[in-house]
Amino acid sequence: MTFTLLPAVDVVDGQAVRLDQGEAGTEKSYGSPIAAALKWQEQGASWLHFVDLDAAFNRGSNHELMAEVVKNLDINVELTGGIRDDASLKRALATGARRVNIGTAALEKPEWIEKVLGEYGDAIAVDIAVRNIDGQWRTRGNGWVSDGGDLWEVLERLDSQGCTRFVVTDVSKDGTLSGPNIDLLRDVSAATDAKVVASGGISTLEDVLELARYEDEGIDSAIIGKALYEGRFTLKEALAAL
């Protein structure tokens, strides 16, 4: 099985944190991001998911720290948070990151994201964060606080623009340890030829194994955050279970 697990390092003001449903102000700190990243590498991670939450919330940047983390690791890193134009994208890629995830700008700048996808191919993934509002899945931007349009319309557009990978988060699940939204992930995967990365809600090894069962449907990886930091299971255990 080639299902990939990406331990997450979310950073606020230079510290590794986790949020509850992505809300600013709900941070719980877990110390040094570099120490966390090295720990996940040691436990066998082949990829790391690194999020600059200050950049995502438009209130600063942890770019130097991101570059330091990438430099100190021998594994693949995907960076996300605040990538909204050519300058921030080039800066992120210059760290040596293997992949850069773009969220808000993919919703708000359709012409720019089409150009970027054409230029950089699978070095770019698109973050699709959603909330169910009155029975309809709506995409979320700007640190998950603004509406970015109907999920299925956004997916159709980005699919036609050449996106090869979507990172899909049900915001109501993120940081809650309440289990992933399998139905949503499968529906998204069925609607696109792109690969889907599951994000949000994983709390048990059973959650990981259930997601991995849908690898042949296009869900080929999962991001794990709070479950690892809270010691629900170790990355080593999760990788061994796969």
Curated annotation (Swiss-Prot):
Keywords: Amino-acid biosynthesis, Cytoplasm, Histidine biosynthesis, Isomerase. GO terms for biological process: L-histidine biosynthetic process; L-tryptophan biosynthetic process. The gene is hisA. The keyword Disulfide bond does not apply. It holds the Pfam family His_biosynth. SUPFAM superfamilies: Ribulose-phoshate binding barrel. Pathway: Amino-acid biosynthesis; L-histidine biosynthesis; L-histidine from 5-phospho-alpha-D-ribose 1-diphosphate: step 4/9. It is an enzyme of class 5 (isomerase). Belongs to the HisA/HisF family. It catalyses: 1-(5-phospho-beta-D-ribosyl)-5-[(5-phospho-beta-D-ribosylamino)methylideneamino]imidazole-4-carboxamide = 5-[(5-phospho-1-deoxy-D-ribulos-1-ylimino)methylamino]-1-(5-phospho-beta-D-ribosyl)imidazole-4-carboxamide. It is found in: Cytoplasm. Its EC number is 5.3.1.16. This is 1-(5-phosphoribosyl)-5-[(5-phosphoribosylamino)methylideneamino] imidazole-4-carboxamide isomerase. The keyword Nucleotide-binding does not apply. Its main location: cytoplasm. One of its GO terms (cellular component) is cytoplasm. The active site is at residue 10. GO terms for molecular function: 1-(5-phosphoribosyl)-5-[(5-phosphoribosylamino)methylideneamino]imidazole-4-carboxamide isomerase activity; phosphoribosylanthranilate isomerase activity.
